[in-house]
Amino acid sequence: MGKIIGIDLGTTNSCVSIMDGGKARVIENSEGDRTTPSIVAYTKDGEVLVGASAKRQAVTNPKNTFYAVKRLIGRKFTDGEVQKDISHVPYGILAHDNGDAWVQTSDGKRMAPQEISARVLEKMKKTAEDFLGEKVTEAVITVPAYFNDSQRQATKDAGRIAGLDVKRIINEPTAAALAYGLDKNGGDRKIAVYDLGGGTFDVSIIEIAEVDGEKQFEVLATNGDTFLGGEDFDNRVIEYLVDEFNKDQGIDLRKDPLALQRLKDAAERAKIELSSSQQTEVNLPYVTADASGPKHLNIKLTRAKLEALVEDLVKKSIEPCRTALNDAGLRASDINEVILVGGQTRMPKVQQAVADFFGKEPRKDVNPDEAVAVGAAIQGGVLAGDVKDVLLLDVTPLSLGIETMGGVFTKIIEKNTTIPTKASQTFSTAEDNQSAVTVHVLQGEREQARFNKSLAKFDLSGIEPAPRGMPQVEVSFDIDANGILHVSAKDKKTNKEQKVEIKAGSGLSDEEIQRMVADAEANREEDKKFQELVQARNQADGLIHATRTAITEHGSKVGGDVIGKVEAALSDLETAMKGDDKAQIEARTKTLEEAGQSLYAAAAAAEQGGNADAASGNAQASKAADDVVDAEFTEVKDDKK
């Protein structure tokens, strides 16, 4: 059995981990980083960039660079949160035929958020494969605890598109608790995991206990907000910078996608810098231009100002903490440890708010960027049988039920119920001689059905005619360990039954998923070919440089015909490099290599010839010296002088 890898598919960054020698290990990507930006870009020449390379070119390609798509996954276009996001991102967001929020490139290509997320998952998969030296097909993927059924299904679909069998969907705070508590001793304790990531917020109250020699992680309650995270903090800074620039220059940068992308990068950097310093400067030269010439943005931002801009967002994260404690039947003083997860928890204001609410300083020994992936790898180890004596008891974050007469939401499974679980309730018909009933499955906490999330509708037909209230229809809900729901309705008299795995009226059909899987496979092949082409070009480029250097050094020593052949081979290779024919580039590279070898051989021969001539001259000089006769002479005195 191969490794089951653990992937934290984050809004801003993603991370992959494996069990290695009994311990979870975070794997560095091809750039040497332990986390990878969850960013995917489509370039003009058809290349798909993922991670740091996509982030680097975002400023020059804003409409084709997709980030924070996790906030769109499993959502309808009409959702208020999606509508709010449209004004904050430079790329296109539109409604698919089924009402889902999809994204669009500048040339009109439409894609589901699942396809974008699949690209990030592929990068994580390849990172693990490169490290392990073997193919990876199975994974545990994390999601925010407060993700609903549609969002969980969509995440599983993204895994399928990426070529992964998703063995388990695990909640992010639960994964972080696993990472924190697996090797900790010291008896039973209750911990709060406060997870404020790039796009989502969760809080889970978890009890860690030793039960019959087994370490048990039981989620007592969870709560959160799937549209609250670091992106919102960034957006507050962007809004402030845009407003200040507008006051100063009278230009609204919201209408300029390039400027908006530069502002996003600058806002994120400023926010990070203000976690360790009291003041920073946002300096963007040539941010835009008008008839009077180029405009520069230069604004000082203090930590106090940043804290004022995001104060309500920080407060917004505390209310779910209060609700989770109440649902768990606990007080803040009952919590033994507070764990911070997610990059946004590095902000001092956030840390202070958490400390004030729980009455204790949060722990600083958990890596907020890596803990979730580590926990996912541990869960993968449990499923693979590599990690023993660990039991994880998670919960469903929202109540599940059906719509009954008068538009009432009737709960069948209450929120914070431990999963997997099953529950049934018996209902009847609303009219005389009714032969079919429609089961409308919903998820949420509102009493009125219309205010909750609609997951699916299906019909149970073939009910025998009878007065209203007489037929008995048993509706059963079954939630698996991934938090994904299966529903059945059965007529007790006829035993006719209708079953459905909830795939959300939104979401992707099997045909769409298969198409996307095929596209991903084709793209993987294209990516491989592209990498091979780049490698061939790089090799050719290096050879061209080396050959030109050789001509400069040795050209004067060899004949014109040799140089002519080398120059011709150089020209042919440079022409080939302008095209995309790898075979032609490789063939002409070989031709140049051979021509280069003849150049070196001719140069070596010329040098040897020169050495032979020099040796001959030296020999003759030596012989002449040998012919000189030493003679004795006597001095003759001339007396005549």
From Swiss-Prot:
Q: Origin, by domain of life?
A: Bacteria
Q: Which cysteines are joined by disulfide bonds?
A: none
Task: Locate the region Disordered.
Answer: 606-628
List the molecular function annotations (GO) for this entry.
ATP binding; ATP-dependent protein folding chaperone; unfolded protein binding
Task: Cite the record's Low complexity compositional bias ranges.
Answer: 606-623
| Keywords carried by this UniProt record | ATP-binding, Chaperone, Nucleotide-binding, Phosphoprotein, Stress response
Among InterPro entries, the record links this protein to: ATPase_NBD, Chaperone_DnaK, Heat_shock_70_CS, HSP70_C_sf, HSP70_peptide-bd_sf, Hsp_70_fam
Concerning its family, UniProt says: Belongs to the heat shock protein 70 family.
Protein's name in the database: Chaperone protein DnaK
| Gene this chain is encoded by | dnaK
